[in-house]
Amino acid sequence: MLRGSAEVLAARPRRTQPLEVTTPTAVVGVRGTQYRVTLDGDSGATRSEVLEGKVKLESPQRSVGTDIAAGFGAAIDAAARAPVPAKLLPAPDLAAMPERFERPLVRVALPTEKDTVRVQVAQDAEFERIVNDQKVTAGSDVRIAGLDDAKWFLRARRLDGQGIEGYDATRAFVLKARPEPPATNTPRSGAKQSLGPVEFNWSPNLEAKSVRLQVASDAAFTQIVAAREGLTGTRETLEVGGPGTYHWRIASTKADGDKGPFSDAQRFELRPLPEPPKGGMGEDGKSLTLAWSGRAEDTQHVELARDPAFKEIVAQADLNAPEWTLPRPSSSGTYFFRYRSIEPDGFVGPYSATLVIEVPRDWRYL
């Protein structure tokens, strides 16, 4: 073997000589065992790990060597130093790995790993048709691209300081990432809007004949409040419910009926409409006193005008509390008041209903 690695399952035929795997730096001989042999292309070292039975690892000249029992591995380099067997590391924990992936880039987190991990993906459970082989450093995610939608098999093993590979952890998984969902546009995640119809917008997916849309009151989509199928455009307007937090997602459906996975959910909030303000002339007859319901952390923008279109504004202010007291206007007649709230994150609510205020003539100055 001049490069790469091999996994050998040697049965017990009637042979007088052991089966041998030869590399430029080592000879590995076995009878009736399962083991691995790897030739490191950078260092020239040969490593062997024994899973069952026993092997003998020695230099090509057979000047140095060692027997390796099951559960151990050893390495020999070009300097032909005597190899020292090391216990194989236990298999990585893949219990948290999902059984199904719905994005073209398969990502597997290994948050507890402190060793480099070798990861292989194959089309078959015997790993005879390996399509991806990589080493992942401690703390990094496994990222696998280029897989078709299908059932796949993944195995992982830890590497020690010599590069000796430990026991396998194996998991099967299904990739169903296509047709990919359209890109969601609005409402964006974290968006706020006032109570009322919500317009959902997305970019088209040319693979899709139609789009499925879901809106839920929970992130797990167990409480779906609105759903549509067969949408052929790039927008849909829906009434989803009262004030609160909602989540929406979309998915593609191909012409043959093949349904793809949903997009990542986007969270948005419907804020309640402002309550009508109350108030009018103060008891002293010298001021206007106005009040409404509002949150302590919000800024209240207020306006007083002579016309219902608020083109003739006579007073306006930004307040820290949901109340406003101002001097009685000098001119009698009809006035119009409204307010709106500005939240700390910059969200500006709609104007309230307009309060009509009648300011009587002040007879004291006649």
Task: Give the location of each predicted region.
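Extracellular low-complexity, O-glycosylation-prone stalks/linkers
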Residues: 116-132, 208-226, 298-314
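Proline-enriched interdomain boundary motifs that mark the N-terminal boundary
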Residues: 86-96, 178-188, 272-280
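Short coil/turn motif common to extracellular beta-sandwich-like domains
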Residues: 99-107, 192-199, 281-289
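Conserved aromatic anchor
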Residues: 106-114, 198-208, 288-296
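Short beta-strand segments within Ig-like beta-sandwich modules, predominantly Fibronectin type-III
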Residues: 132-138, 226-232, 314-320
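Extracellular fibronectin type III
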Residues: 162-175, 255-270, 345-361
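Beta-strand-rich modules
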Residues: 149-161, 240-256, 329-345
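Flexible, surface-exposed loop/linker segments and immediately adjacent secondary-structure boundaries
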Residues: 1-102, 185
